[in-house]
Amino acid sequence: MPRRTPAIALALVVCAALAAVAFARTKPRYLPEHRARYLPEYTASGELILPKNSIWREWVFVGAPLTPNALNGGKAGFPEYHNVYMEPGSYEIFKKTGEFPDGTIMFKELQLTLSGENPDGSRTEPSGRGYFPGPFNGADVTVKDTKRYAATGGWGFYNFNHHEPKAPTATLKPREECAYCHIANAKKDEVWTQFYRLLDK
């Protein structure tokens, strides 16, 4: 009976080599693919359309500053958590270039604090005394477009209500309502990167 061991061994080596080549050409599923960017959409009259299906909650979370009323004489301009998300495709470009590309959407979802039990507006929960997130309360959105918003340094500012539900569309805010403060005080390109460590490079 002829010996087949060398032939079988050779076949196994060839199969293993082919499998290795195929594996090398296939990206593992856990590696992130290049993201298709979610770009801003506008109505025919130029209003910004609220991103669909609350998709911003799946975007890159960059920070949540808090300015409660109780610490601002009851008159805080934004008496909520500012839960800020950045569109992922734009974030990938920012990581590589250090610049916010045209089409960048920064979505600030406002969230009230739970009612306070103390003069400073804080309350006590199992984790300790502090401020705790409550109901959502509308949203502010900024969009980068150096041509469309040339008059305000390349960014457009929008409000989708300071209550729920969020408005389906929003009109561009005048320079004196939002842009002037960002231009004067934000650390990088009208973005408060000094409060968003993920972006503070």
What annotation goes with each model-predicted range?
Residues 27-34, 45, 55-58, 68, ...:
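Sequence context surrounding c-type heme c attachment/ligation sites in exported
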